[in-house]
Structure formats: C-alpha cells, structure tokens
Amino acid sequence: LRIAVIAAIAALAAGCCKCRSYQKKNRRPLVGTEWQLIQLGGKAVKPEEGKFTLTFLAEENRIAGVGACNRIMGRYEATEKGVLKIGPLASTMMACPGMEQEDAFTKALESTTHYDMDGPMLLLLSNGELRAVFQAKP
C-alpha cells in the first residue's frame, strides 16, 4: 500500500510539473487582454471574429466587450484571490440574430463571483459553478 501511494504521488507530481509550467508560460493577464468566449453555460461557442469578446481595462476598472452585435460596457472589481464582480452592465440596443445568446452572455457576466486562470484561458464562475470560458486572443 505504501509503495502504491508513493507511486501515485510521484506520477501526480510529474504530471503537474508540466501542467504548471505550461499554465505559467501561457497565462495572460486578466487586465488588458482581449478575451474570446469559447464556452457559455457548458456549451461550446463557435468563435466568430468580433463577437462575444471581453476586455478588462485598468482605467477606472472598466470592462468593454461585444455580444452578438451590441457593445457591452460597465465596471468590474477583481482581487488577486480570484474574487470578481462585473456590473452593472450597459449595452447598445441593436437587434440581430443571436440575441438569446447575447442575453445569456451578459447574465453570465453579471452573475460572476470568481474567476480562475488556466494557461491562456479565463474561467468565470458563479458560486463555484462554471458560467463561461474565454480564450486569450493572440
């Protein structure tokens, strides 16, 4: 039993070293990075140029983004410990295809309580539940 436990710990440590190295090397800063939505409410989102993006701006803790066709703006508060509050949000009022997804997008943003980073990915959570996943744009 002791050998099995030691072997399991060694295998886990070896695997994590590569993961942590990748995560640190490819991690992007929360602020100043343009984030592209790739998953919303557990469903994959096809990345479309100029749609469903988000940028956290340092000046006055502002947030800017684009939904299906509307510009989204507002404020955010973030801590280094992963606490994140977004909103209230405002947006332009154009109508276009994809409005249901845009509504779900803004609701996910406003319900966010925490964030986590995984390599070039930004994960938004609401009370422990994954709400949205973004990938850093190059």
Give the ranges of each region predicted by the language model:
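Sec-dependent bacterial lipoprotein signal peptides
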Residues: 1-14
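Lipid interaction determinants
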Residues: 16-138
